[in-house]
Amino acid sequence: MEFSRRLDLFGPEIFAALNDKKVALEAEGRHLYNLSVGTPDFAPADYLKQALIDAAQDNENWKYSLRDLPEMLEAVCSYYKRRFNVDTITPDEVMSFSGSQDGIGHLGLALCNDGDLVLLPDPCYPVFMTGSKLGGAEPWYYKLTKENHFLPDVTSIPEDVARRAKLMLVSLPANPVGSIGTPELYAEIVDFCRKYDILLVHDNSYSDFIFDGAHGGSIFNTPGAGECAVEFFSLSKSFNVTGARISFLVGRRDVIAACKKLRTQIDFGMFLPIQKVAIAALTGPLDGVQRQCGEYQRRRDALCGGLRGIGWNVPDSHGSMFVWAPVPAGYKTSMEFCLALIDKAGVICTPGSSFGPSGEGYVRFALTMPVEKIGEAVQAIKNSGILG
């Protein structure tokens, strides 16, 4: 059977190779420190679990939802006002997705035609590339490098490229590189997109994880963003409900309407008990989210400071739940180093090459273990002699 040629758009599954190595070592009885996948190790709050239990008791909630509950859309609007001080969002400017990955993956199908140009960060979350290619769009990568502090630089985008571009995807705080935006940077990006009539798509999944006293916001804190932007906003990491797959697309009505039209052809909406969990999270206390950010910063300090202490010059992450580390000397590729690190130290991270061409030469660590376990992982790296 000949399968879809669309599958040829995607490269080899790097995570499968890492998992094969992990399974083989576990079969040998090796103890491993898995810092590769960005799944929080914190438990969801009890009130979220109870919301799910209560909703599941109602037989009506086991039917197709067909639409987003009006009270959930209102809760998103209220949350934007409470959390981000943005009071301009209305319910018809909000829709749900089964996680931001689902939304970004389908975005190109709703918004792009064959040959449209999409501006993507390099490196980036892989689904940015996937969603663009599935929509028939042509990606143009703007580089996130050490020299530009891993931040978007709109002045690096040529005039002819800007005039052709239909979408620009931005992720701040950034997965995988851990950079964060400033009001000045957001203003530059919004002005650029307005000038060239580009739809700005902001992935705001990590707005609650910003370190060293800085504070996360929304793209809609930036004047003019309402004219040119939409934003993905997720509950997955902030509320430790990654498996529940709860995210929202917020912003321009015409974009929301187009994405809703596509979604009605693909599924029958978010499971109603999950919508009830979303309402509970959006209207509930935020102190747990704030404490969690402090814990991620302590983990960041333990990993980055610990690695620097054993001779690996890893800069501090400024936000997200990830650390972006340069591959030590002596290794040709990030994948080669990752496999060696698993084999010699039992520590699992993700090769930077899986996030785009500019990711080569780096690896990504996820801050998904307690401080003491991170300390053990650092000691295992030291004892392995892998750093020379």
Where are the model-predicted features located?
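A short helix->loop->beta-strand "cap" motif at the edges of active sites that frequently abuts
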Residues: D116, A137, K195-L199, G226-E227
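PLP-dependent aminotransferase-like
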Residues: P91, L109-V170, P183
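Conserved glycine-rich beta-strand-loop-beta hairpin in the small C-terminal domain of fold type I
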Residues: I279, E295-C304, V314-P326, G359
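Helix C-cap/helix->beta junction micro-motif
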Residues: L25, G135, K195-Y196, I310, ...
